[in-house]
Amino acid sequence: MGILAKIEQPRDLKGLTYPELEQLAQEIRAEMIDVVSANGGHLAPNLGVVELTLALHRVFDSPKDKIIWDVGHQSYVHKLVTGRQKEFKSLRLYKGLSGFPKRCESPHDCFETGHSSTSISAAVGFAKARDLRKEKNQVVAVIGDGAMTGGMAFEALNHAGHTKTNMIVVLNDNEMAIAQNVGAMSSYLNRLRTDPRYDRSKDEIENLLKRIPGIGSKMAKAAEKAKDSLKYLLVPGLLFEEMGFTYLGPVNGHDQIALEQVFEQAKMVKEPVLVHVLTQKGRGYEPSEKNPALFHGVGPFNKVTGEVIKKPAPPTYTQVFGEALCELAEKDPRITAITAAMPSGTGLNLFAQKFPDRFFDVGIAEQHAVTFSAALAFGGMKPVVSIYSTFYQRAYDQVLHDVCLPHANVVMAIDRAGVVGDDGPTHHGVFDISFLRVIPNLVFMAPKDENELRHMLYTSLQLDGPVALRYPRSVGQGVELTEELRELPVGKAEILQEGKDITLIGVGPMVYTCLAAAVELRHRGVEATVINLRYINPLDRESILRYARMTKRIITVEDHMLAGGMGSAVMEVLGDEGLTDVVVERLGYDEYVDQGAISLLHQGYGLSVVGILKAAERLKVLQRIEGRSSV
C-alpha cells in the first residue's frame, strides 16, 4: 500500500517525514496523470501545485482554516488529500467528482470557484466574518499569476490592504523562473519583515531621529528614502507592499521545507501577507513540462506518449469561426480581434499569427476587452471580441453601457454557448440569450451549423451597430462550407419545411434535432413545420405568428435556460397578439446543469428526438411514444 492510500484527511499529512512527502508527491502525480488521461481535465496546473498543496495542508488546519482556490482548476491535489480518493476516478464525469471546488462535496471546499480572480475577495469576506464573530482561524487565498491579471483581484487587494485585514494571499507564479532571488537575501528579508522586533526598532529609530534639534526631521526623511531605495533594489513585491501587504518570497514552490517555513512565517503576521511562490506548470510529466499550454485543459490522452486521443470529426465551430475571421481580415484591414486570455480556446490563435498587429489578448479582463473594443470601433476599426458565454456575464455592464447604448460597431462572438460538458455549471453558457436579447439595438444571431456561422460572421461585419453571435463548443454538423459568403436578411428566420400539425422552432444546432424529430413525427402521421430562428433579436415575428396560427401547437428547443430564453421570446410574441388558443411546450433548462458529456446532458433535459416526441405527446399531437423511438 502506498502512502496516498493512507491519507484520509489533511491531518494525516502532518506526521509524514520529508522523504515520505516526496514519495507521496510522486504518487499524487501518478494518480492525476492516470485519471486525467482517461477523463480529460486540467493536468498541468495541478502537477505544478503538488508540494504547495501539501505544505498548505500541513501548516494550516483545514477546514477550520479557510483555503480558497482561485479558478479552482488546480484543486485536484486538494481533493485527493481531503477524503475524496475513492471518488477521484469519477473526476469530471456525469454525477462524479467536480473538477472545481464544490461546497456540497466537502467541508474543505469552503468557497466554490470556476471563474478567475475571485479568491482574494472571498478571503477578505471570510476574514471579516471571522473577526466579527471573534473567532481564531487563518484565511488563505491561492491565486495564479494569470488570475492576478483580473481587475477584481486588485480591487480585493486594495480593500484588504486598506483595512489591514489579517489574511494570507499565496501567489502561485508559474511563469517566473526559479532564479537567484530565491536565496539567502530573500530568506533574510522575509525573516526581517516578519520579526516584530524589526517593526518596533524601526519606529523607535524614526522617533529618536526626529527628536534631534534642527535636523532630526530631515534625517528621518533621509533614512526613510534610504529604506525605500533598498526596497526597490531588493524587494520584488514592492507593488504589494505599497498596497499594504507584507511580501514574502519568492519561494521555490517545489521545496517542501521552504514552503512550510514561509507559511509559518506568514502566520506570525497579523496583517495582510502575500507569499510569492514560484512553480513549474506540468512538473513531473515530461509531455506536460514541454507543452504546459496543451495540458492546461486537455482531453483524454495516451499517458505513455502524451498524445491527445482524437477521433475523426468535422471541424469545431470555434475552428470555423477563427478561419473565417482570418479570411475576412485578409480583405479588410479594419478587422481586429480581441480575446481575454483565450487565444487558442476562441480560435483566434490563427488570427494572432497572421495579423499580430491587429490582435489583442488583454488578459483575464473581460470588462476591459469589451470597452476597449467599443473604442476601437469608434476609432474606425471593426473589432470582433471573442469571449466564452459564461465569461461574458462578467462584462454585461460594458456590453450594455459602452457598446450597445452608444451603438458601437462591435461584433461579440459568444463561444461555448450552451452546455459545455465536463467543466460543469460554472462554465455552461446557458444565460446569454436571457441577458442579451433584452437589449433593443443588439442584433443577436445563432447559426444552425458551421456553414451558417461563416455567413453570419460575414453579415455581422456588414452591419451598422452592435452584433452578438452565439455558437457552441462542439464539432460542427459536417456540412459543406460554401466558398462565397452572403448576407443573411436581418430578423428573418429560415423555414426548413412546412407542416400543418405542429411547429418546431430551434435555435442554433438544436435545429438539426428538430429536423430529426420531424422525420420521426412524419412516420407517425404528423406533419411538422421546422423553423431555424437564426435571429434571436430582432425576432421574425411574422413567421412565428403565421405558423402559430396555422398549427396551433409549438415546441421551442434551445440549449439554454427556459427563463428569459428563446421560448419565452416566442411566447411574448404570441401574448402580444392575444393568441390564447396556441399551446407552447418549451424545451431547455430550468436549473443549474451538472457536468457530463454534452449529448448526455441534452438527453437528460429533453433536448433530443425523444424529448421532442414526448413534448408532442403532451400537446396531444401523438399517442404515447414511450419506448418506441431511439434518440
UniProtKB/Swiss-Prot annotation:
EC number: 2.2.1.7
Biological processes annotated in GO: 1-deoxy-D-xylulose 5-phosphate biosynthetic process; isopentenyl diphosphate biosynthetic process, methylerythritol 4-phosphate pathway; terpenoid biosynthetic process; thiamine biosynthetic process
Pfam families: DXP_synthase_N (PF13292), Transket_pyr (PF02779), Transketolase_C (PF02780)
Cofactor note: Binds 1 Mg(2+) ion per subunit. Binds 1 thiamine pyrophosphate per subunit.
Residues that hold thiamine diphosphate according to the record: H73, G114, H115, S116, G146, A147, N174, Y285, E366
Pathway it works in: Metabolic intermediate biosynthesis; 1-deoxy-D-xylulose 5-phosphate biosynthesis; 1-deoxy-D-xylulose 5-phosphate from D-glyceraldehyde 3-phosphate and pyruvate: step 1/1
Enzyme class: transferase
Keywords associated with the record: Isoprene biosynthesis, Magnesium, Metal-binding, Thiamine biosynthesis, Thiamine pyrophosphate, Transferase
PROSITE patterns, sorted: TRANSKETOLASE_1 (PS00801), TRANSKETOLASE_2 (PS00802)
The organism's place on the tree of life at top rank: Bacteria
GO cellular component: cytosol
Co-factor requirement: Mg(2+); thiamine diphosphate
Keyword Magnesium attached: yes
GO molecular-function term, one example from the UniProt record: 1-deoxy-D-xylulose-5-phosphate synthase activity
Binding site for Mg(2+): D145, N174
Catalytically driven reaction(s): D-glyceraldehyde 3-phosphate + pyruvate + H(+) = 1-deoxy-D-xylulose 5-phosphate + CO2
Subunit details: Homodimer.
Family: Belongs to the transketolase family. DXPS subfamily.
Function: Catalyzes the acyloin condensation reaction between C atoms 2 and 3 of pyruvate and glyceraldehyde 3-phosphate to yield 1-deoxy-D-xylulose-5-phosphate (DXP).
Protein name, entry field: 1-deoxy-D-xylulose-5-phosphate synthase
Organism this protein belongs to: Desulfitobacterium hafniense (strain DSM 10664 / DCB-2)
Gene it is expressed from: dxs
